[in-house]
Amino acid sequence: MSALETQALGMIPMVIEQSGRGERSYDIYSRLLKERVIFLVGEVNDQTANLVVAQLLFLESENPDKDISFYINSPGGSVTAGMAIYDTMQFIKPDVSTLCCGFAASMGAFLLAAGAKGKRYSLPNSKIMIHQVLGGARGQATDIEIHARDILRTKDQMNRILAERTGQPIEKVKADTERDYFMTADEAKDYGIVDQVIAKRP
């Protein structure tokens, strides 16, 4: 999350730490990054994806054996940006534990399901929504046809991954993602997007 985006969320609290060498202040997100916590808040786009990918790679370099916590409150966004995050989550050595706090829709829900099996969580009043890939091509008919073929290929790719991550049959995933498919936290658990609904830390 960039400084400009965090400013848009309102006043960002600062945390002051004292040590033998004096005081140091962090914005709250940087302090939580030290605890291996990453946030995806708002739309998935190239900028947010680059920041999340950079944080994942940094935390892997700090300790490749310790889990990373990825908190998601996102309506979704760009497929290509989201796939950059997804591929990095699978690429790095540490397990990435995902947690939905609020809303995970579209690419947000896809990334929620992308967490390490057994380590995907949702808070009890969160909502999750899956649907098919969106696209908007303009221009010459031939160009639109090329884009349509690519969107259909991407749709099949994402359905296949979601079926694999959730354990649902591919035909069910295809049918459910034809339109917006909303779920409560418990329904998302039954679907296989998350492994556990938690109200308090264990």
Swiss-Prot record:
It is an enzyme of class 3 (hydrolase). It is found in: Cytoplasm. One of its GO terms (molecular function) is ATP-dependent peptidase activity. The keyword Cell membrane does not apply. Belongs to the peptidase S14 family. This is ATP-dependent Clp protease proteolytic subunit. The active site is at residues 106, 131.
